[in-house]
A protein has these predicted regions:
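Catalytic-domain carbohydrate-binding cleft regions of carbohydrate-active enzymes
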Residues: 1-113
Length: 113
């Protein structure tokens, strides 16, 4: 990540680099926002992402998050989606992002109103 940031700065010193990665090394928090990777749209993935995000925070990575609602799999059932959103609002990176077409809160109807 330092190389990427240096390249952007060399290209234009008026631009502040912003990188997103799913893994890194000690010190990655100085260079990039980290997300937990492409997760499944299931209850277990929500549980595992909570543990992953807590671990990242304890490791000094303050700018982190996950794909709210899951990335791979069927569209999440309404209760699962609400729980993902409730968890996601406390993360610096809140992104409803998946291979499905329902990528906004409004795509899930009144369940989040």
């Amino acid at each position: 990540m330092p190389v990427s940031n240096e390249a952007v700065t060399e290209y234009n010193e008026n631009i502040r680099p912003f990188s997103v990665c799913r893994s890194g090394h000690a010190g990655i928090q100085r260079y990039a926002q980290v997300w937990a990777g492409d997760n499944l749209t299931c209850w277990d993935a929500l549980k595992y992402n909570i543990a992953t995000i807590l671990g990242m925070g304890l490791s000094g990575v303050a700018n982190h998050g996950c794909d709210v609602g899951g990335f791979y799999g069927e569209s999440p059932e309404p209760e699962l989606f609400v729980r993902w959103v409730q968890n996601g609002v406390f993360m610096p990176r809140f992104s409803i992002h998946s291979v499905n077409t329902d990528n906004t809160v409004t795509d899930h109807g009144c369940i989040v109103a």
